[in-house]
């Protein structure tokens, strides 16, 4: 398995100098300056500033939603999407960050779906305030994944998602880190049910050479095995990538159509 290591984003000392009023309340240490990245509010401030400074993107974060790691999402999209492609982002979330990266950084035409009403509205705000409404078409789903949401004759160079991965019986950790059941519960005994449906429904929508890319926590080995098997069942060539961002490890799984 290929391993990629990337930096967390920006040095705390650097953003403290530029945004002292925003960063100082998040500090747990002054010398050297450190942010408590286990605190959701501090994590939100940090990633909003990373998005602004590195991507030139302004993000509005929904107070109940998961806070995405900007650098890991950037690397994920760059590994899965090529410049100027047509992309489907399934479950874009309240920030629509993967769709925004694909559209703004790679010049892609993106169809982004979201089923949670509050997240859909927040994603719309982010698309508008970054002037990407001509490149991103936001679609409200009603619990469907791809079938019934995307026209049958619409095909893509890449289908991407940060899928839910917890089994149905697991209680989400939303009170501490944010995240609705839709963001966290992948369904079934393993938590892979959402991903398996996405692969089965998405494969027929891939152009030749098209890719399905999913990113999950590195420790979710059973989910990864289920995803890999499902991609192979759809005759996709599978690549697993270990992505290390700071102290966090994620697995990117890419299935490519021949």
Regions found by a protein language model. Name each.
Residues 49-53, 70-85:
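Conserved alpha-helix/loop element of class I SAM-dependent methyltransferases that forms part
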Residues 68-73, 191-195:
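Phosphate/oxyanion-binding active-site loops and adjacent basic polyanion-contact surfaces
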